[in-house]
Design a protein with these regions (language model features):
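Bilobed "Venus flytrap"/periplasmic-binding protein-like clamshell domains
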Residues: 54, 75-90, 122, 144-198, ...
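Acidic, polar ligand-binding/catalytic clefts
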Residues: 95-161, 239-241
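Periplasmic-binding protein-like
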Residues: 52, 140-147, 222-262, 285-288
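Extended ligand-binding regions for polar small-molecule ligands
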Residues: 82-91, 151, 164-165, 173, ...
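Short, low-complexity disordered leader/linker segments with a strong preference
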Residues: 1-44, 288
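Alpha-to-beta junction loops
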Residues: 93-95, 111-120, 165-166, 202-215, ...
Length: 288
């Protein structure tokens, strides 16, 4: 009887030990963000972006120019956002891991902890601040018009001169909201991404895209039939400070990550940002 009891006790202890190991493995697997370690032993900085929003970010087939492999993909990500992300990761002694996420999924991915940060050309609006925190700006993006070079809109000297245009922009952006400032505008439904916006303009579905300078400049650089139209400050699109400040979205209360990133960004000037952006515009795939 004693032997049977000891045998059963051994089986019980073995089962309990296995169960504890499973739980421990599950807890370890659930640790995300900066706690994750790469094969190198470094922490991993998980950054989300669309990888389809040149010149801020795009996808390419190789690591040419310093592109970073997209997690779970054979593609690589590059662009202004990746250049900034690499600087941040290097300063933090972390390995950079890029996650390709649709625009509408970026903030939720930050909130859930799927990624540590969204570096994706995101304006620091009050609405977004309800769900995420933002770092100091890593770019300042003036709102402009993107039109066909041979269109009447190309001669506009003010937003008022765009009267009666057929316009659209990207979904859930401040650009789409700015369209309402154009007199008698015909506002089409918003488009999911920047490539879709360009197609709509080139195909004649619309004759005006409202966007920011980097996006318009990159589109015109890659498409000779398009041009960017800028306006004097008193005749341009009326925007708030938060509309033009582009920040990095991080989880609310993550002061450690915010401080680490802000330390790097505070050491950079607007001229530094513009220099990196110009480099990104020249390197975008369609610019070659």
């Amino acid at each position: 009887m004693k032997g049977v009891f000891l045998m059963n006790l051994k089986k019980f202890l073995k089962a309990a030990l296995c169960g504890a190991m499973v739980v421990a493995m599950a807890v370890t697997a659930g640790c995300g963000g900066g706690d994750k370690k790469a094969d190198s032993g470094k922490k991993v900085l998980k950054v989300g972006m669309e990888c389809a929003y040149a010149p801020y970010n795009w996808s390419q087939s190789s690591a040419d120019g310093g592109a970073v492999k997209i997690a779970g993909s054979n593609e690589y990500a590059y662009g202004y956002d990746v250049m900034i992300a690499k600087k941040l990761a290097d300063s933090m002694g972390a390995d950079l891991e890029i996650h390709k996420i649709e625009w509408d999924g970026l903030a939720p991915a930050v909130v859930s902890g799927k990624i540590d940060a969204a570096i994706a050309g995101m304006s620091t609006t009050s609405k977004r601040k309800e769900s995420v925190d933002f770092t100091k700006p890593y770019y300042y993006a003036t709102v402009v018009a993107l039109v066909k070079k041979d269109s009447p809109q190309a001669q506009a000297k003010s937003v008022a001169d765009l009267k009666g245009s057929i316009a659209t922009s990207q979904l859930n952006t401040i650009w789409y909201d700015q369209i309402d400032q154009v007199p008698d505008v015909k506002k089409l439904p918003a488009i999911d991404n920047v490539p879709g916006m360009i197609v709509a303009l080139k195909s004649g579905k619309c004759n005006l895209i409202v966007t920011d300078i980097p996006t318009a400049k990159a589109a015109a650089f890659a498409n000779p039939d398009l041009t960017m139209v800028t306006f004097p400050e008193d005749k341009g699109f009326k925007t708030s400070k938060e509309d033009v400040e582009i920040g990095i979205a991080i989880k609310k209360g993550n002061k450690e990550l915010a401080d680490a990133m802000n330390k790097v960004l505070s050491g950079m000037t607007e001229a530094d940002f513009n220099k990196i952006m110009d480099e990104a515009i020249k390197k975008q795939p369609l610019a070659k």
